[in-house]
């Protein structure tokens, strides 16, 4: 049986199944992500959906900017590939990922190794190392 398109769940921007059962459980809610990879996926979804409040709320206070600029007009996020997720300590983790986007007809890849910390039981984005951008 084919699901009714009107009631089919929206796909999650992070590439996993339904948004409401994936990143939608964390973006704009008080439910903390259970691990750094889940938090990183929810942050990617927040970038796709322009939910800057989630990005700020999940950024560690020690490195959080005062504000996040809106995305450039016409930016389209095309996909996320998580390459590695590893614990680096009892309350620290790294997630390596590639996020693809398109702007003004040009494709771009963002390759980052992000660092996360668990503070008072919640995971937060700390910072990341970004490889030089690749266009094309």
Swiss-Prot record:
User: Which SUPFAM superfamilies does the annotation name?
Assistant: NTF2-like
Q: Which family does it belong to?
A: Belongs to the UPF0225 family.
The protein's name in its UniProt record: UPF0225 protein Mpe_A2093
Q: What is the lineage of its organism?
A: Bacteria, Pseudomonadati, Pseudomonadota, Betaproteobacteria, Burkholderiales
């Amino acid at each position: 049986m084919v699901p009714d398109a009107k009631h089919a769940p929206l796909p999650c921007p992070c590439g996993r199944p339904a948004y409401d059962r994936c990143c939608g459980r964390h973006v704009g809610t008080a439910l903390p992500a259970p691990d750094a990879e889940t938090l990183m996926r929810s942050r990617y979804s927040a970038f796709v959906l322009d939910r800057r409040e989630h990005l700020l709320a999940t950024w560690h206070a020690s490195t959080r900017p005062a504000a996040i600029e809106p995305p450039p007009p016409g930016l389209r996020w095309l996909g996320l590939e998580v390459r590695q997720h590893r614990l680096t300590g009892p309350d620290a983790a790294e997630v390596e990922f590639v996020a693809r986007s398109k702007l003004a007809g040009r494709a771009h890849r963002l390759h980052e190794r992000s660092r996360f910390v668990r503070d008072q039981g919640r995971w937060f984005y700390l910072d990341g190392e970004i490889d030089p951008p690749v266009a094309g």
